[in-house]
């Protein structure tokens, strides 16, 4: 990373964009508790959700900032992580001109969003050990490469990328390095959040859908420099996170001990499932995991997938993904769910 300047990456139209100003944005610095709001054409009769939500989700950001040791100005919230990722494309990638890089096998939405935004998507395969091939990645970079996506722990492989490889990419690439940490809470490795101030080109995405158990409310999180977050705030929809989502997130975030207990239970169930998988006759390889799932190579993925479906067990068949021929991905369930899976595996062995 040499002479990094965010202004060299922001799309020209976004630089001059005047963002939409919602009714509530104009009063964000006032004590609104006793104010009468007749500005947004809302239904005035109280039912808990008759008013528009806070467009900046200030209460949620304050809690997240305290938990992570950051400033609220380093946080953007979205309607799931996919919205956050889409905003990165729209803020920094010029259609038909720019490109991004991802490292298959990995989360498929990077490529989908690139196609939606008409941005070239370059794929540099991971190594056989599912680590970034740093030299190949950097060789693929052009002056129009805006983002490199690193999913760590990676989906579907479950492993984290080495600190050395990520650091090299951060230091040698003058675009944004987006580290997708959807599964970081299941890993013993530290988050890259502590490095935000060191690397202005570092962006981190997280979610409440995995360890926090709130997939149904759709809340994704982007952490970055205040300058990055300011750009994303310019282009985000004004009320992209609804009131019910904000309320439910606050309730959950204030109960960290329960979250920690659930994570501990999931990891314990992961270890129990690993022991059973080691005894299944058709399992050929079990890949190391730091997530709430296990990637397993079997003799015939399509056959074993169909057999489990018949027994009422739904898993993910990843055999069509690069480097994942005949691989199945098992999400870690409750103890009861895992017992059903374990019994089914024994029955089809």
Report the location of each language-model feature.
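N-terminal "arm"/small-domain region of PLP-dependent enzymes with the aminotransferase-like
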Residues: 1-66
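Phosphate-binding glycine-rich loop
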Residues: 59-99, 117
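Conserved PLP-anchoring active-site segment centered on the Schiff-base-forming lysine
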Residues: 91-113, 127
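Short beta->alpha connector loops at strand-helix junctions that form conserved
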Residues: 104, 120-128, 318-319
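Active-site pre-lysine segment of PLP-dependent enzymes
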Residues: 115, 134-143, 156-177, 181-214
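PLP-dependent enzyme catalytic core of the Aspartate aminotransferase-like
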Residues: 164, 310-311, 321-349
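PLP-dependent aminotransferase class I/II
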Residues: 201-279, 286
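Conserved PLP-binding catalytic core of the aspartate aminotransferase-like
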Residues: 266-267, 279-311
